[in-house]
Structures are given as structure tokens and as C-alpha cells.
Amino acid sequence: MKFIIKLFPEITIKSQSVRLRFIKILTGNIRNVLKHYDETLAVVRHWDNIEVRAKDENQRLVIRDALTRIPGIHHILEVEDVPFTDMHDIFEKALAQYREQLEGKTFCVRVKRRGKHEFSSIEVERYVGGGLNQHIESARVKLTNPDVTVHLEVEDDRLLLIKGRYEGIGGFPIGTQEDVLSLISGGFDSGVSSYMLMRRGCRVHYCFFNLGGAAHEIGVRQVAHYLWNRFGSSHRVRFVAINFEPVVGEILEKVDDGQMGVVLKRMMVRAASKVAERYGVQALVTGEALGQVSSQTLTNLRLIDNVSDTLILRPLISYDKEHIINLARQIGTEDFARTMPEYCGVISKSPTVKAIKAKIEAEEENFDFSILDKVVEEANNVDIREIAQQTQQEVVEVETVSGFGPNDVILDIRSVDEQDDKPLKVEGVDVVSLPFYKLSTKFGDLDQSKTWLLWCERGVMSRLQALYLREQGFANVKVYRP
């Protein structure tokens, strides 16, 4: 079998040296992706296309599918490469190939020709089209919007019978641009923004700020692995996970409510910039869109950017949510994003949309930056190829209950402000308050003869914190969902 890879048009308008470099990189990327399917596969580059030849017919569909997901490819032609002698020979081969496909249909013939011949492309189109029209009684020529377009390519003494055309994702080959670090949360925005930078030729590494324990990290790892495996597997990339719970805890205790969102984002940018510098990455990528949430106003984004010299790319800055969700659906991350948890208690209730630099800096003076340095130093860095095996390990399950027994105590894990605004009172059972960001250090001080029913407004943080405590060896925890 043979495939002809057509280049993304922006590649073809580059200077000769740049075009050759892009084609060389794309050829290498194709080899890296396809070698897992057929070790005998051959990839040959030319000035205006790349040929892929393989012997194992059983791998035809998977090879074709893989090619449609490699950045830099405009479209793929599946072809049968045969020799020919003259125009009549071209017609006979076209008739044998397309007879069944053209019965009862309207059609036209389109020919591309390279090399020296005694005929022109238009002459071949007329001769083959007329012959097909005469020999297939139910077929009819229609030059505009036909049911079937018969594509033929003539190159020297070879005829390429095009059996199918399949669209690629376009863009630039990965590796033609410099590396970036995507701040991935597993939601709609970060997945789409990561894809967009891969499509633009960047090798995308991933940085995840863990706010909710092992279950959340496993979910985000699966999203990152999916994106890499589907669109970027030609290159090795890193997945860096930073336990940000201590940072969130410090913010909730030391920072004014209205400034929390901006301060949290500034801390994330500081941490990600340190990771980027460590690995020689040139830019950060976020999924922020202008005005989508309070921290994404121009004033706040400017303040967030000011904490680092590292370039921050925001490919979705002008996109609306519907457009982003549609893109997530197209690339296959929508289902991941819809099931990814949101966190109660992490963002302030009355966030500022126009933060003042002096006030933000004054709030940050109360922050213990040694905590930020420590979580970055302890960040977990893994090769993304290992994630498939690691995420297969089962997360400890935790029981969810709607009632309570005589030995049960409800543990309200919301932030202090949320508890003050809406105190939890449940008749017939004791309620104890312990904010989620203190669970890792303070839960062991509680009466371990009791069964603790963790509760929060949405039930997401309580489940994740219960999972975390179970992993730490505490078997006396459940989730309370009345």
C-alpha cells in the first residue's frame, strides 16, 4: 500500500532552506509514529510530498488514521501506483478502478501531471472522462459538484490511481518550533490550548497543579496522555505534577478573600516558570479566555503576567466557551473535561475583577514563599509514556453515605469563610469543622475511634480528600451526601 502525504500550504511558501527543514522534520515525525505499526514501513520525502509505503495490508486503516493526526499534514492520498504506456492505458486502468464506484453517479475527472508527456492534463481529463461516460451507461459527467471526483496523478511513466483522500489536521510539524509548558487542569480550555500549540509545531510538556489528591491527578494524567498519544507521540514529553494544596492552604489563611484568585494564579505562574527554566522551556501555555472568569480580565491577566519573565501564550484568549467546547469535541477531550471535578473552597466568593498591584503585593507579603519553593522542588516529573501504566493502578474506593450511625461524626471541610457564612447543622449528629487544606496535617489529631463523614457543598472535594486519607492509611473515613 502507498500513501502520498501533502504538505500544509504554509510550509510550501517558506524559503527553500526552511521548507526543506520542515519536510525533514515531518518525515522523521511520521517515521516515529508509524514504526510501531510496521517496522518495514518506508517513508520517503520529496520536494512537494512525502511517500509512505508499507507491506502489511492489515495495518492499512490504523496507518491511515495515524497519518490524519500528525501535525504538518494537509491531506493524505491513498493510491495505487502502476506503470502506463499512453492515454488509453490510463483510461483502461481508471475504468477498472472506478467502474463500480461510478455506477448511477455523476462524476468528473481531475488530473495532476508532472514530467514530460505528449499530452496535457486537460487532454487526459477529457479522454478518460469521455471513455468512462461511454463505458458506464448509468454514469453521467457533471463538472460542478459531482457525486464522485476521479482523481488521477501522472508522474513520468507512473500513474497514481487515487483510492481515497483523507484530511489531516494541518499546522506545522512538531519540533519546528520551540518547546512549551502547558498548565493543564483537565478541563475544556487547557486541553484545547495544548492541542493548538502542538498543531502549531511545538512540543508540549504538561504541568499540573494538584488541588485534590490522587484521583484528580490520575484524571488529568489521562487527558495529557490522550493528547500526547493522539497528536504528539512523535516526541517524548514530560508530565510534571506539583502538589499545590499547601500553597492553597497558605493563601486561604493569609490572603484577603477578594484577592485570592489572582494571587493563586500568580503563584501558579511563578511555579510553572521555575519548572520551565529547569527544563529549558521557552513559554507557558494556558487556556485563559478574556472575561471568562474574574481572574481573566485584562487588568488581572497583566498582573498575573508580571510575576515572571517567561512568555505566556494564551491561544484561546478571544474564544467563547461554545467554540472551545466544540473544539474539545473535535479532538476528543470533551468527555474527559465533562467528568473532571470542580473544587469547592478554592476560589474566593467575591473575587476582584480589577486587582490593584500594590494591594496584591501587600497581600503576598504575608505569604510564606518557602512553601512555594518546597512544592516546586518536590514536583513529580514523569515521562508521559509511563503514564498509561501508572494510571491503570486502581484508586482506593471510598464509601458514600446519606445517613449516619451512633459512632459517626460529620467533618465539614469547607474553607473557614464558607463555614462562617453557612454553618452546617445536622440534627442527631456532631459536626466538626476542619478546612480541607488542613486535613493532611491535622486529621491524625482527631479521635480515630470515630468514623468521620467528610462533607462539602458539591461533594467533590470531600470525596477526593477522603480518597487521600484512605491512601494515607485512615480507614475510618466516608463521604457524606444527604
Swiss-Prot record:
Keyword Disulfide bond appears in the UniProt entry: yes
Single GO cellular component term: cytosol
Pathway field: Cofactor biosynthesis; thiamine diphosphate biosynthesis
GO molecular function term, any single one: ATP binding
Entry-linked CDD domains: PPase_ThiI, RHOD, THUMP_ThiI
Segments forming domain Rhodanese: 404-482
Catalytic reaction equation(s): [ThiI sulfur-carrier protein]-S-sulfanyl-L-cysteine + a uridine in tRNA + 2 reduced [2Fe-2S]-[ferredoxin] + ATP + H(+) = [ThiI sulfur-carrier protein]-L-cysteine + a 4-thiouridine in tRNA + 2 oxidized [2Fe-2S]-[ferredoxin] + AMP + diphosphate; [ThiS sulfur-carrier protein]-C-terminal Gly-Gly-AMP + S-sulfanyl-L-cysteinyl-[cysteine desulfurase] + AH2 = [ThiS sulfur-carrier protein]-C-terminal-Gly-aminoethanethioate + L-cysteinyl-[cysteine desulfurase] + A + AMP + 2 H(+)
Domain named THUMP: residues: 61-165
UniProt-listed NCBIfam families: ThiI_C_thiazole, tRNA uracil 4-sulfurtransferase ThiI
Listed name of the protein: tRNA sulfurtransferase
Organism annotation: Salmonella typhimurium (strain LT2 / SGSC1412 / ATCC 700720)
Gene assigned in the entry: thiI
